[in-house]
């Protein structure tokens, strides 16, 4: 659907890079839909560090899935300070640093992409996403939330529930 929308749009000066973990039937359908259109490139099986480098070198990250509840690709973009855009699915509307497409039409896609061609807009969104990632999704933030949750289960009278005293003793060394 995304490839068809781009092909119907007036977006001519933008290259869309697909980072695909494996070549499969869906990827082959994408290749057929792309044909010889020079606006699209597919990279398969990149090592983790190269995926991060590709994201950091991008102007924006796009997710065109309606089935993701909390997409890791968007969280990766946020961690790199790269703006993103995606259809309104799952928890995307609660994330900062991107544009949620309320309407999955070629014109909505074109408008979002065109807005992200502005460097000030990209920097503003990217920094908002990075701040939210650091506060809520970075490993230190997640560990702190888990620690608070685990320790909140200790009973007020000082009698810990089963295993919480073991967790308290060993958590700082984990």
Predicted regions located by residue number:
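Short alpha-helical segment that forms part of, or immediately flanks, the ligand-binding pocket
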Residues: 52, 71, 75-79, 90-93
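Short alpha-helical donor nucleotide-sugar binding micro-motif in glycosyltransferases
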Residues: 53-58
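A short hydrophobic beta-strand element within the catalytic core of glycosyltransferases
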Residues: 61-62
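Aromatic "clamp/platform" in nucleotide-sugar-dependent glycosyltransferases that forms part
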Residues: 66
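Conserved acidic donor-binding segment of nucleotide-sugar-dependent glycosyltransferases
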Residues: 86, 98-107, 114-120
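A charged, aromatic-enriched C-terminal amphipathic alpha-helix characteristic of glycosyltransferases
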Residues: 120-151, 163
